[in-house]
């Protein structure tokens, strides 16, 4: 791999002026319009790549430390903004005097162009995200002007050929440089590269050929979507130009929170409080789920902060609604702050019997249940 300093013929401590002087000298020597040798164009590109890497202080520092790998192979032709407009001139040479840019060519601007994609943010309820729904939305987008049918010209008229460029969309001018006289190709300033001008614009769209209108769409929200889910509605973006295809509409989902339920992925979480008697003896309680109220069995001896699961009561998996997650219920046990005399007598009697049956244990009934010694 060639060293950039060697390519330019300078030392590694060369300053910016030395680099520029060396580059100009070599660029003139190897420019393919001046030097007809078979390898001149490749050499000219190599010189440009080396100068671009070393002309920028940050890029040069990375190159000095890591070599060409440190600049990611991103070096190409240098920014010629401070060299009297040579950049546009060299761009013309490398594209065969066709007036095409490195982004694909001005000729493409005159052909069909795809319309822009659009974004629409949609807030939906918690349950609607679980089970899906159809929603009607109203979006603003660009459509072809019905009056001029997209021409931009007043009805009964049409675009005319640009007299400045003769319909080519490009203008040429002679430029004197240290390399000699060259012809520079640029976008026509009169028609902006289109090749046609509209003398009598359409009053409905102002000569643009498109108008912003609001359109009602009915979209299908699949079961299992979540905040951040992006839905693509094909062909509902802005209209394309000159017969190009329309863009797409992207609907970004934002799911509202629920006061009782929380969601993590395909599972749903909630809490329930039961009395200490329900925890000890067991019970059946009603639980609010996305499917409505369902019965949840509290097994006898349920410990505080344990989790019980309702299978297949969670969120359908996006793209496979038959497969659902679970609803996880965190059980909180409520301890009474006050008890009646009768309740105390019953509990003490129970504690006494429990202690007799478990005399070898160092802890009593209340210790096991509530963390207190009996």
Curated annotation (Swiss-Prot):
Q: What is its main location?
A: cytoplasm
> CDD domains, alphabetically?
DnaJ, DnaJ_C, DnaJ_zf
A GO MF annotation of the entry reads: ATP binding
Q: How is the cofactor bound?
A: Binds 2 Zn(2+) ions per monomer.
Renumbered to this chain, the Low complexity biased-composition regions fall at: 103-115
Q: Which prosthetic group or cofactor does it need?
A: Zn(2+)
> For Zn(2+) 1, which residues are the binding ones?
145, 148, 202, 205
A GO CC term assigned to this protein in UniProt: cytoplasm
Chain positions covered by the region annotation Disordered = 99-118
Any one Pfam family here would be: DnaJ
Start-end of each CXXCXGXG motif repeat: 145-152, 162-169, 188-195, 202-209
Locate the J domain: which residues? 3-67
Keyword annotations from UniProtKB, A to Z: Chaperone, Cytoplasm, DNA replication, Metal-binding, Repeat, Stress response, Zinc, Zinc-finger
Compartments annotated for it: namely: Cytoplasm
Which positions bind Zn(2+) 2? Answer: 162, 165, 188, 191
Intrachain S-S bonds? none
GO BP field:
chaperone cofactor-dependent protein refolding; DNA replication; protein refolding; response to heat
Q: Which NCBIfam families match?
A: DnaJ_bact, PRK10767.1, PRK14293.1
Sum up the protein's function in the record's words.
Participates actively in the response to hyperosmotic and heat shock by preventing the aggregation of stress-denatured proteins and by disaggregating proteins, also in an autonomous, DnaK-independent fashion. Unfolded proteins bind initially to DnaJ; upon interaction with the DnaJ-bound protein, DnaK hydrolyzes its bound ATP, resulting in the formation of a stable complex. GrpE releases ADP from DnaK; ATP binding to DnaK triggers the release of the substrate protein, thus completing the reaction cycle.
Assembly behavior: Homodimer.
The name under which this protein is listed is Chaperone protein DnaJ
Protein source organism:
Prochlorococcus marinus subsp. pastoris (strain CCMP1986 / NIES-2087 / MED4)
